[in-house]
Structure formats: structure tokens, C-alpha cells
Design a protein with these regions (language model features):
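Charged (often Lys/Glu-rich) extended helix/loop segments that serve as interaction or gating elements
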Residues: 262, 266-418
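Structured core elements
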Residues: 73, 96, 118, 140-142, ...
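A charged N-terminal "starter" segment
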Residues: 1-137, 178-180, 184, 218, ...
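Conserved active-site and cofactor/substrate-binding residues in soluble primary-metabolism enzymes
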Residues: 8-11, 27-34, 58, 123, ...
């Protein structure tokens, strides 16, 4: 069982709400730090191990700086994420730039910042050389194993159907071209799963990359210096799910590392992950208030939050656990659809969910909203994105992003010539 708790009491929460009205996202600073330390320590056996935080998960400079202090880098996929890194002070090889269908302006910024370029497309070698004039001495190449790897979901897709990465044949050709053009340092990357809780599946991804590195060494004489295993380490969204044990995962990867890489003379390959979801996801909460009850063919609880605050349930049908503050131990003897006010019928945080009796004014907490929550927010239907708060170990709170206003919403419109 995966007990779902909150890092504040009802009294603490009411004090926070007195200053910052609902809805808002709040992140548990201590939880993020301790979880990240645990992950990094699990892989301490690998001398060059690096975790790059997937900025897209929670693109907030406070979160990024928090992780930077732990030695965590940044996995960027867009110009905006690169600019965030620049403002935080994350540069050089502390950035892995993993993008696709990439405009040159984004490559240009990544190269100016000294980021490692993770090539998604073999044609981008020529594209970069033509537009930039020269290539850096370090490259990573994204591998799409196709039918060799099962899995995928609506986010990543089945490998053979996904738009990402290169085939095995293209990987070898890309390495030949890059070496001929003077590139000296090579890496492999793959990302074929998302929100994976099965450790065997995660280790299988590592084995896939390790075998590829061995084949590259044998066939091309090129030594792969680093292997980025992507993200994909999952979050146990449901109470009955078991979170990934970092120690068990690390042991599985280490066994494969020794069996495949070390056994073939590749003793010093640095490993990396670019996790985002598991870093902040379990330590973020969407705090809302029940403002309406409606009884027709079903029983509805209307919140002051909507899918503009958390899109995952509507977009993916994802489960997010719900706690009603002060009623944690009350019997779950009511069945509700928990909704927002968007003019879309899929604006539902829960469908036919067994919950305690909810009254108007109750504080409703939506769990595991720390990744791909606020960052996937939007303004459709004129909705405003909510504030982000950081809860410190001593119980104090820092607002790390203010709530949007209607002035923000209309700021790009020109009313002067109406």
C-alpha cells in the first residue's frame, strides 16, 4: 500500500489559505530534497552519474535552484526551458538538450550555453552544420529501438509508432558522420517508457542501451562515454500501487552494467537519468475548495479548481488521489464526480469516486500534482493559472509564482483601435 498523506495539518492549511486563496499548487520542499538525495545516492556506484531534471515537469526557478544545489542538472526540450536555466545559472554540460523537430534558434541557444545536444534526427547533423557552421565536440544521439522494446503510452507512444529518435541503422550512420566531422565524445539516449513502475522494464531499457554501446564499440571502434537512460521512473498515483524502490532499480542496472558493459571493456561509462515526474510529482498538491454540490443523474462536487489547474485526468484519464481535509478517517460512503467549471464535460478530477461526505467549504486536496500539473495549465475559457507555493521544513511558505490576473490574460490584446 502507498499511504497518501499531506505535509500540513488542517490548521496550517487554513493559515496558508488566509494569505493565498485557493486554488493553488503547493510543493513539499523537504520531500523533494530527501527523495532526490535517495535517488542520487542509490547510483553512487557509478562514478559519473548525473540526474537531469526534466524542466517541463515543473518549470519553476525555485524548484530548479533547489535541485541544482543537490548537483542536479536540467533536461531541456525548448527555448523557454533553456532561458529558465540561464536565469537560474544552469549552463554547460549540466544541460541535456533533448528536443525534436527543433528550430535552429533553439539549437543556437543551447550551443551558446554549452549544453549537450541530444540529436533526435540524423538529418539534423547536416541541418546544424549548415546553420551553425560547426559542430561541438560532444554529442548524444537518441535511440528508438522500435519493436525491440515493448511498452509506451499516450505520452511516449509505442516505439515503432513514436516520432522520437533514430533507428539502430541511423544511430550507426550518425556516429560515423559525427566522427568524420571531428566529434570526439559520444553518448546514447533513449526514452521509451513514461510513468513506469515495473523495475524489470526500467532495467530492460538499460540493457538495451548497454548492448547498443557494446555493438558500437565493436563495429565502429567508438567508445560511448555516457548513456542517458531517459526518464520514465513512475509515480504510484494509486494507493494500491507500489512506488519504485530506487535501491532495487539501481542494483538491477548495476548488474546489467557489469554483465554487459564491463564484461566488454567499457568500464567507465557514465550513466544519467532525466527524471521529472518522480522528482516533484508526489510532493505537489493542488489545494481547492468545494463551492457547489449538484444532484441530478449523478452527484457532483464542484471545485474552485478546474482542468486548467490539472489537465492530466481529462487528457489521459489519469487517477489522482483525493483527500478531504479533516475527513481523512471518515467512511468513504458517498460517490461523486469531482468537477471544475470549464465548459467541457471532461473537466473532472474524479469520476464515480468513493469519498467521504463533502460539504461546501471543505478543502479538497488533489495528490501527486507536483509534475505536469501547473506546467500544463492553460487559459481556455478564460481560466487563470493558479499560484505556486513552496512549503518549507519549518512550516513557512514562499510564493514561488503568483496567480495570474485578468490583466495578464488580456496583456497581449490591443483594445486601442476598437
Amino acid at each position: 500500500m502507498n499511504k497518501k498523506t499531506v505535509p500540513f495539518t488542517s490548521e496550517q492549511l487554513e493559515n496558508i489559505i488566509a494569505q493565498y486563496p485557493t486554488p493553488f499548487h503547493i510543493y513539499d520542499e523537504e520531500g523533494i530534497i530527501e527523495n532526490m538525495k535517495s535517488f542520487i545516492n542509490a547510483f553512487s556506484w557509478n562514478k559519473g552519474f548525473k540526474q537531469y531534471f526534466a524542466v517541463k515537469a515543473t518549470p519553476n526557478p525555485y524548484i530548479m535552484r533547489l535541485l541544482q544545489k543537490l548537483g542536479v542538472g536540467a533536461d531541456c526540450s525548448s527555448l523557454a526551458e533553456l532561458l529558465l536555466c540561464e536565469k537560474v545559472g544552469i549552463t554547460g554540460h549540466d544541460i541535456m538538450f533533448t528536443s525534436n523537430d527543433t528550430p535552429y534558434v533553439e539549437y543556437k541557444k543551447a550551443l551558446e550555453m554549452g549544453a549537450i545536444i541530444n540529436l533526435d534526427d540524423i538529418t539534423h547533423i547536416e541541418y546544424l552544420e549548415k546553420n551553425h557552421g560547426f559542430l561541438p565536440d560532444t554529442f548524444c544521439v537518441r535511440y528508438n529501438p522500435g519493436s525491440l522494446k515493448e511498452g509506451g503510452n499516450t505520452i511516449i507512444g509505442l516505439p515503432e509508432e513514436a516520432k522520437y529518435g533514430m533507428t539502430r541503422e541511423q544511430i550507426f550512420e550518425a556516429y560515423k558522420q559525427l566522427q568524420a566531422k571531428g566529434v570526439k565524445h559520444f553518448g546514447i539516449h533513449t526514452m521509451v517508457v513514461s510513468n513506469e513502475l515495473d523495475i524489470d522494464g526500467l532495467v530492460g531499457t538499460a540493457e538495451l542501451c548497454f548492448n547498443l554501446a557494446v555493438d558500437i564499440k565493436k563495429e565502429l571502434g567508438i567508445t560511448v562515454e555516457f548513456i542517458d537512460l531517459g526518464g520514465g521512473v513512475g509515480v504510484a498515483y494509486k494507493p494500491e500501487q507500489t512506488p519504485v524502490d530506487f535501491g532495487v532499480l539501481s542494483k538491477g542496472v548495476e548488474e546489467a552494467y557489469n554483465r554487459i558493459l564491463v564484461a566488454n571493456g567499457l568500464n567507465d561509462v557514465a550513466l544519467a537519468y532525466e527524471c521529472g515526474r518522480m522528482v516533484t510529482g508526489p510532493f505537489g498538491y493542488l489545494v481547492s475548495t468545494a463551492i457547489h454540490k449538484k444532484d441530478i443523474y449523478r452527484h457532483y462536487i464542484g471545485l474552485d479548481a478546474c482542468m486548467a489547474n490539472l489537465m492530466r485526468p481529462a487528457l489521459y484519464g489519469s487517477y489522482h488521489h483525493i483527500t478531504v481535509m479533516g475527513k481523512e478517517n471518515a467512511p468513504k460512503d458517498h460517490v461523486y464526480d469531482v468537477t471544475g467549471s470549464l465548459c467541457e464535460n471532461n473537466d473532472k478530477f474524479a469520476i464515480q469516486r468513493e469519498l467521504p461526505k463533502i460539504d461546501i467549504g471543505d478543502r479538497v486536496i488533489i495528490h501527486d500534482a507536483g509534475a505536469h500539473g501547473h506546467s500544463m495549465g492553460f487559459n481556455y475559457n478564460g481560466k487563470l493559472r493558479s499560484a505556486e507555493l513552496l512549503l518549507h521544513k519549518d512550516g513557512s511558505v514562499t510564493q514561488i509564482r503568483r496567480a495570474e490576473t485578468y490583466d495578464d490574460l488580456f496583456g497581449t490584446l490591443d483594445f486601442s483601435n476598437l
